[in-house]
Amino acid sequence: MILDYAFNYSKRTLSVTYINESGGKKILNFNVNKFKSYFSTPTGSYLNWDGSRCDVKWVDNPHAFDIRTYMEEMNEKYKKLLQGKTVPRLYTFDIETEISDEFPEPSEAKFPITTISIASPECNVIVLGTKDLGENGVENLQERFEKYLNSSNFFTGLNIQMPYIKYIKFNNEHDMLKYFLEQIVAKVPVLAGWNSIMFDWQYIQNRVRGYYSDISLSSSSMNRTMTQKRYADMRGNEITLNIPNHTLILDMMDVVGNFDMVVMPIKESLSLDYIASESIGMNKIKYDGDLQKLFETDYSTYVFYNAIDSILVQLIDKRFKTLQNIYTQALYCKEKIGACFSKIALTNALFFNYFYDHGVKVIPKKQEDVERGTLIGAYVRTPTPGKHDLVCCNDFASLYPSSIITCNLSIENLVGTFYDEKALIPFKEDKANYIVVGGAVYKNKGTLAKPQLGEFVSYYLLEDELDKYRRNPKYFVSVNGSVYKNDKTYSFKDIQATLKANRNTGKYLAKQLEAVVMTDVDHIIADKAINNVPYAENLVNAMKNIGYNVHCPMDLCNLMDEGLINKFKADLQKEIEYNTSFEQAMKLLGNSMYGGSSHVAFFWFNMALANDITGEARNIIHTMENHIPEYLRENWIDLKDLHKSLGIKVDVNKAKSILKETGDFVKIVYGDTDSLYISYKGLLDSLEGSETMSMEDKTKFIVGLNTGYLDEHNREFMKQYYASRHVDSVQNFELETVALSGAWLDVKKRYAQILLWKDGKTYDIGNLPMKIKGLEMVKSSYPKAAREGLKRLVRYLLEDQTDSFILQRLNIKMMEEKSIFFKAELEDICGNVGVQNYTKYIISDTDPICLKVAPKTPYNVRALGNYNWIRNVNNLPGDPLYGGKVKWYCYYPGGKKHKKKQEPEYFAFQSRNYPKWADQYAPVSREDMFTRTVLDPFNRIMEAIGIGTLKSDGSIQMGLF
């Protein structure tokens, strides 16, 4: 696995670091005077990716692809080193600084760094410091350390040896920083912390620059080279930091916040204490007073506090395992790990690798300023607002990758676009009212300055020219009017098809190794009987890849006799974990390639291709949106064999009555990107005895109809549809969920459902899960108490029968929720929000009269400004805050007596760090918070359903009749 590579132009040295078998890093240095590159020439000996001819040239200044070519053509012994599956050892760190009356700004680094803790993958901790721990200091630390770890179910469940804690005292800060940079940073492969780049690393860098000029920052790199990278801080200011080459420095807060969608989909805060508490059940160390006082009066606890921060980050990585997917993508793409957080870098790598493997060259080009143009987004149907019963979600499996594969869309086979430019002229000139994208015209629902894509008007294409290509099977014509060669499989299709196949292989292999081989290993270790059935070829090959010649369980017994079974088990577990992450990595790569290819930084960027991928995806979902209701409308009554197989009978009179009244048996309620939400109530009502059918029977009917008939029918229909366009369909449009009922608002991507069935599982009728999208109850920005209350209210609404008394019943429930909300902990009723651009909007937070803000200051920035202003003018304790994720609430300056005379103000504070003085200076208004976060969102759902609204005081306005 490649950790990093960098070319030193002055020394003409290409340095490549890789992860060795122990998870450490090794460096390879190659003296390269000139790199092989390619240039365009009609008499060239080689084929360029676009079909033109090219030839070799040797260059001093290599393009990124020239470096990749060099690495591809290395000696095999070096290439083998770069292809190892071992993941890097992750070390975590944290710094503490002295604190005076002001916040230790990392950009200034005025205060000394007091301690630095480093945790290893085994959770061993070293703390660097400049004070004596005192007698028995390390022993006492070890005792507290073990007690802390043993109190965690997550840690004890890891079954690792009890780690140690070690303390190293330095004579001064200078020596401590020198040791940290040279002996820690330069030697570890990956170093991560929490907010570690914008605070810890920036602070260390500026501390060294400002106070210790004899320490070279380049000593933090194993070959003493650095790379400059640009970041934006919480105030919106751009900063440039030097990052060592060959040590990957990560911010685990960023990794968890941006790349985890599984372990914690909802994150109210990105504070270390919150994430650790919610994910691994562990907390930062609590202490009385402030941290500076702790440093001065209880240094042992101060060191312990610092050590635990590093341990928490280490354990969070073990819980989330987000980096495993990044590592696997890096290995598959033959790219350095740090680049694999970028979809664009991954997509470039996949295309380059494909062309290289097929003997096709890539002529480097300079990055040009390209106007991106307008990318048409995914199809989202305007919902039919209201409450709908028995709604199915049918969705496409991997819609965008499948569209690329089906339609053979790629970068090198695009012939051209055939737009009727003459017909488009009046629309292009009328930018206030229209937006032109390729050959498509849309209404502009925005303004001239800020256009916004509105209703589709029409395509304006050169149909006569396109028809020639439509009749020729060697071409594919997109719905947008682009023409692609279709005489063979092209790169994008081939890459996506390979990723899809690899995903299935990795998924199956991981499950088989776990279920078959690992089970046999456990039985042998436990001295249980085993069946000596030979293993399948794929399992034998997998074990051969990790160095074992195992063909059957008896070979495992031989390993037991040789004392190697435990080593084999550990190696097998690593292989299972690799294949599990491999399956996920293939999925992520397949889905991210479309996003990467639609960005101007993509080497082969072409907006026509990006829009064709989206356009074909939109087209097929539109096609199914029309086909399913039409097919059932025309055929349902006559599908006698299907009725028999489902064990039902259709009441023909009822069926005809339904068609006459509604026009269809099924109704499309909503469409979203790759899914259609279809109500089957009309179809059910057409059955004999539908009035007495149980919910279990209704679910069984809908599931049977889809999985036993419609899924395959849809597949066959799409095959025929695409065959008429000269391509082979790999699309699958299948049943995903069946819902008891659901509520849709009159805006896109806002709904809630109660599920009866999902992906083959029928839920117990007394314990039905909810599926919610876009509503406040699943938004991490909403208070915890509000989310929980809204879920209970919406569940009651969806499960209850709509009748003339529903408003009264809901009112009772609402008042119960209000009582619960008013008793909740303060932090649980506060919203969560990120704050940026503080200095852009806050003119002064020290003015003695009031907070000075710029016009149109966002409420969240104002809330944080109020925190700083109240603290500053009243000389109150606490650190200044200028950005990041915070909690917020409404309050009335001057108290409740001023409530009727003014709008509420906003106040913000850090999660789990509420300042007690706010009780006096900014007391929360629970009434306002309840109205804003519970009552108003629930009323919006009730309005969509058409049953009126509720009031905070519990009163109901009833009609006269």
Describe each model-derived feature in a short phrase.
Residues 1-186, 213, 307-308, 312-331, ...:
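DnaQ-like (DEDDh/DEDDy) 3′-5′ exonuclease domain used for proofreading
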Residues 19, 703-961:
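C-terminal, non-catalytic extensions of nucleic-acid polymerases
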Residues 129-266, 274:
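Conserved DEDDh/DEDDy metal-dependent 3′-5′ exonuclease domain
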Residues 154-169, 236-245, 448-492, 530-585, ...:
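Intrinsically disordered, low-complexity acidic Ser/Thr-rich regulatory segments
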Residues 186-204, 249, 253-347:
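Acidic, Mg2+-coordinating catalytic module of metal-dependent nucleases/exonucleases
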Residues 212-243, 566, 570-573, 633-663, ...:
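Short mixed-charge
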Residues 290-432, 528-529, 537, 544, ...:
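Common nucleic-acid-contacting/processivity interface regions adjacent to the catalytic cores
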Residues 676-709:
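Catalytic palm subdomain of template-directed nucleic-acid polymerases
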